[in-house]
Amino acid sequence: MASGWWLVVLAGCGRYRDFTLPQQPGGPSVTWKWQARPDPVLTRDAAGEWDAVDVLNPSVIRQGDAYYNFFSGYDGKAWHTGLAVSGDGITWHKEAKILSPDPGTWEGSSIAANGSAITDESGILYYYQAGDPPQIGLARSRNGHQWQRNGTPVLTRGPYGSWDERGLGDPYVIRFGRGYYMFYLGMDRARRQSLGVAASDDGVSWYKLRGNPILAPGAYGTFDANGVGEPAVWASRGYYWMLFTGRDGGEMRRLALARSRDGVHWDKLPMVIAGDQPWDSKVICDPSVIVNGNRVTVWFGGGDVAHPAQNIHGQIGLGELLSAPH
């Protein structure tokens, strides 16, 4: 991880600013190789359970000697967040459902999931999608089992005419130095889905980049022509890297890679990753990464039905990106 703090230019006031992440030095070109286990590592439960229809959106962190996976489960009516624990990141034990949407609050009744977990001095912070229109909430925990919600969204949709006026989703939060950064999906009036970034001093009060979006859908006929989403960001080998999901015109979903030196200006790379097993033949999405040297472990969602949301027979797989200089 880079040291230091973000560069901020106060070009105005309110909840928008100009900033970058700490500058990365760059370096030699890097070749990435993808390999994945053939079978899912976290599967749907039996009919009638809270995660019987889809299991997607892993967010994996280390807690001592264990891996904690905060994943999303769909029961046919609503999305919930559950916790699974593993000693090796491969064999998982489902602990419990930990968050469900609260209809008596801003969250509504359809979703409290699609989240991103990180740790700081206060414990575990879990940023999740909820509400209609969708926005980003925050829950905190000391142990991963008992949670306290923030009460109001920490990141809200943009004003009329903005790139994210219809709603937000797919948060992915990282820390560099003293800063928190959230990469997220925004949807405009035409329902185009792009990616943006926000920054925070404390993980609670956020301001959006004035120049959002930072990653847009591709041209007609490309793998991401229908939208981009579900980012996962890390730093290694002199750059920031982003795995993201692209949706094509037939709603097939694939993963792709982008690169940046400042976390704001991104270049899409040629690498596109498609599912190659029957269970993820139509959709591969929702990456969550842990970096260990030249090896990036990637938990991801997959399905065998081409659909932009749920009912894809979703399950969670495990892969690796291995890097080497040219």
What are the functions of these language-model segments?
Residues 1-11:
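Sec-dependent bacterial lipoprotein signal peptides
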